[in-house]
Structures are given as C-alpha cells and as structure tokens.
Amino acid sequence: MKKLLKTAAVAAAAAIALAGCSSGGSSDPSNVSPTGEVKPREISWLLSRPADGAVINIMKKLADDYAKDHPGFSLNLITTPDRPSYIQKLETLAAANKLPELFDTDATPFAQQLAKQGKMVDAEKLLKSLDVYDNYRPSALDYQRFDDGSLRMIPFQFELEFIWYNKALLQKAGVSVPKSLDEIPAMCTALRSAGITPFAIDGQDQWPLERYVAYQPFREAGPDFIQKLKKGEAKFTDPAGKKAVEWLASLGKAKCFQDGFSSQGYSDAQNQFTSGQAAMYNIGTWELPSLATDKLNPAVRNDIDFFTLPTTDGSVTAANEFVSPSGIGMAVNAKTYDPLVSDFLKFALTKYPSEYAATGALSPTTNVETAVPANATPLYKKALEKANDLGDEQAMPWDTQLDPTTNGRLQQELVLLVQGNITPEQFTSTMDSTIAQNAPKFFK
C-alpha cells in the first residue's frame, strides 16, 4: 500500500508540474506533413508492452527494414512492461519536457493535459495524411479518443474481453452460464459448495479487479456514468454507482475469487484456470495462444469455452457491447516530429497490420484477415468472429479514465471491499470524497 500511495503522490506532483510548464516546442500538433529532407538518426519509443510481444517484435523488424534504405536510422525501444512503473516514468519525463519521439499512453486525464499543451501530434490528421485512417476499426480508434472526441494515440492492437469458463466444473456444481450479472454471486456460492474456485484473478496487478467495478454501471447507465463520475458529476451514491459497490461486495461475500487473490499475479491466475482449479477466468483475446490452441492443458482443452459480459434486467447496453480495448496507444511527440519520423511512420503503419494479423492476433484495422494458427482449437475462430458483431458502445476500463490519485485509491479500496475489510458505505464515502478532492485538478 505504501508503494501505491507513493506512486499516486508522484503522479499528482508530476501533474502539478506539468500544469505549470509550457508546451516546450514550437511544433504545431496539427502539422502532420512536415517539409524538408529526411535525415536518418536514432529515434526512441517509450513503451509499456511485453518485451517479447508481437507489437515490439514486428516494429523491430519494420525498423530494420526501413534502415536498409535509410542508413543511420534506428529505433530505440525503451520498454517498461510494468504499468505502474511505466506511468511514473512517463509522467516524470513529461514534467521535465524530455519525452522521446514516440511514447505509449492510454487516453487518461494526464495524457489529455499533454494534448492540451500541444505535446502530441493530431493522430487523426496524421492517419488521414498517410491514407490509412479509413482502414482502422472505428471502435479501435474510439478507445483511444479523449472525452472531446480528439484522437492523439494510434492503436496497435484490438482485443475482446471474455469470461472463459470450464464446462465440466460448471456442470459439476450444477450451474449454467449466467444470463445476468446479478446471477454471478449465487453462481459463485454454488461453485464453492462443490469445492471449486469460481474465478481466477490476477489481484497483484490490480487492473483485473478494477474491470469488475465498471460492469454494473455500464449495463445500468451506459458509458456516460464513468465520464460523469471521474469529473465528480456523478457519485457512487447514485443508482449505478450503488449497484456497482453492492455487487462487488456480494462477489466478495460469495468468495468468487481465489483465496489470497490480492497477492497472486498474472501467471498464478492463468495457471489456476488452465490447470482446472478455477471455473472462470476473465481475460482478453491476447490470451488466445494459451487458451485456444494445443498449448492448453489436454486435461481441460475440450472443456473450455467463453461467454461475453452478461447483461442485466433493464440493461441500457446490449449483449454485444462489452470491453473491447485497442490497448495502450502510441502518441507522437509534436516537439520532435520531423520529416524522418513522418516518413518512418508512413512506412511502418502501412506494413504493420498484415504483419500483426499474420501472428494470429486481431488487427486494429479491417483491411487484413487474421491468420488462424494451425494448432488452434475451434474456439480460436469463434473468438475472432465476435469482432464482426460488436455494438456501437464499449465498456471503458476505469483505470484509463480516472485521474491518477483517484485511480490508485480505487484500486486499494476495491481489494478491501471484496475482502470484507470495509463496508460498502465506507467504500462509497471514501471514493466520493477522493474524487471530489482530485478531479478538479484534471477536469477544469
């Protein structure tokens, strides 16, 4: 907890410092076609992605290909996969006005401050100037947009989040796939009675639990609730907020998550599900290679399936509307944007989609077809096809929406709520006051 409080404090300090500094460059964020000679040099990309992941591997290859015709060019990848550490690094560099040519960020309140200060190139104009804008999935771009609709980040992924489940374990407990979110607590109780852990969750990284607090409000009030909540225009005492808090508390009482979940990490959760110890696992299509190929444990392979986020009685969003993120986006530093950066991005963004789709992943664009691996189970194709039937709304992860201090506090309080260490009333009081104190610094 001390580490979390320290991170939140650093983020707040960086925000204050950022608010006091100028844009630091004369570049016009809307000037996406800089004139002049392309002069090869090293450019850097500050990113928060798996070091051995497809995005980095492909961009390394494309950078090497570009360098063949542009001697002296290189792409320096500065990666920090751990998200809290990355955010701290990003905010520190931004406050010091030392951001590299390219940098990763979600569409957070902090990032919107950077955009307002002219530090980020207009990504919509950039993509249109490269004649690739229309290739992108609208939902992939919408995920990257700020509240005002502006686009400053470019997506490199497109994912769908499902609740994966073990059919045999549900059958053993005498339960079926829930039709409503409200059925899940009772479902967990039945699974526990049968000696089965209901959900495997990565509690250590905190964002997986934070997903759950977004679900009831998204069904009850749609995507507008978090837009208002983060600004202090809605509260946890409102019907949608109250329903979220009470539901999270009921998940805790029903022992929906594995014992000691708060200290267990990503691989722990994955192993619990793939070894048949847990009945359900809430994760995205980035895990298809682990869950829908012959890499999956043969003992459970034929029992695995998935369902999408259940609706609720009177839900204002549809069953085909759920969390469909395009991952952390890449911003282009307006201060260092020059003919070289422009030329490299044109080269890379034109070739990237086909390279990415060839890995078996969903591209953020629709002009390429994802290659289904030879070792895939039928579930792989079934999951990919869900991308063709998405509604217009999407559930935004709250960690991309809240100010840094509020988000850090929410993650702490959610663990305490689910563990039964605090009451719903205590949670509500703490969070509403935290938002009231911190939102004005970011949403003026």
Annotate each language-model stretch with its function.
Residues K3-A14, C21-Q112, Q117, S129, ...:
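Conserved N-terminal structural module of periplasmic/extracytoplasmic solute-binding proteins
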Residues E124-Y136, E220-K243, K295-A299, T311-E321, ...:
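Short, solvent-exposed loop/beta-turn-alpha elements that line the ligand-binding surface or hinge
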Residues D148-F156, E161, P185-A234:
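Extracytoplasmic/periplasmic solute-binding protein
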Residues P100-E101, Y133-A168, T197-A200, T317-V323, ...:
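A structural signal for short loop-to-beta-strand junctions that line the ligand-binding cleft
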Residues L229, L362-E369, K382-A436:
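C-terminal capping/gating helix-and-loop segments adjacent to ligand/active sites or protein-protein/ligand interfaces
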Residues T108-F162, P185, Y212, D305:
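Hinge/lid segment of periplasmic solute-binding proteins
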Residues K68, A173, A254, K295-G360:
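Extracytoplasmic/periplasmic substrate-recognition and gating elements
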Residues A190, K231-F261:
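Glycine-centered hinge/linker elements that transmit conformational signals in sensory
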